């Protein structure tokens, strides 16, 4: 609905159709800050506002909500999951990269893949975040085209999903080759 650069990607009619026809079928929606702001007609700019937004969107659409905070100010990012009346925060250091095109789509696809493998939602999100951080890290030095480039979905090495509490742990476990 809204790109990472803040640009609207669809008409109001399309957004309304998504809200009325698609969201009722979802078990999870994953709006970024701009999308959460658009859906609620209120700015969402910090973690407390993300929690309020996640709760309100979950109540409105009757599903779990992961508000993605990749564009929060500062060096730390935080995603807020609201599921069954409970918040889970996923905080990590930002990885500096201009190659972030497709992060939201990749994250939601990875969550779906881990859920399909039998993981509970919180664990699926945690493992998807490890995957996405690793793909960002391995793609940060790629020079493909102009402007925002893609993540590196083809990094080598197996990810064994042990608890990793920070981006630094991800980088140590999966060094760039």
Feature locations, PLM:
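Conserved phosphate/ATP/ADP-binding segment of small-molecule kinases
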Residues: 8-87
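Conserved beta-loop-beta/alpha segment of the NTase-like Rossmann-fold superfamily
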Residues: 4-5
């Amino acid at each position: 609905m809204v790109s990472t650069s803040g640009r609207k990607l669809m008409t109001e009619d399309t957004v309304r159709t998504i809200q009325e026809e698609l969201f009722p079928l979802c078990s999870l929606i994953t709006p970024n800050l701009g999308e959460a702001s658009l859906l609620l007609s209120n700015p969402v700019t910090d973690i407390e506002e993300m929690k309020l937004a996640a709760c309100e969107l979950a109540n409105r659409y009757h599903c779990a909500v992961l508000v993605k905070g990749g564009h929060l100010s500062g060096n730390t990012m935080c995603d807020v999951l609201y599921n069954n009346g409970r918040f889970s925060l996923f905080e990590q250091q930002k990885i500096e990269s201009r190659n972030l095109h497709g992060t939201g789509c990749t994250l939601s696809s990875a969550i779906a893949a881990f859920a399909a493998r039998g993981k509970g939602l919180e664990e699926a999100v945690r493992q998807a975040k490890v995957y996405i951080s690793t793909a960002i890290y391995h793609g940060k030095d790629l020079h493909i085209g102009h402007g925002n480039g893609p993540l590196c979905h083809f990094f080598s090495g197996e990810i064994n999903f042990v608890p990793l509490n920070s981006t630094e742990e991800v980088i140590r476990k999966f060094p760039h080759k």
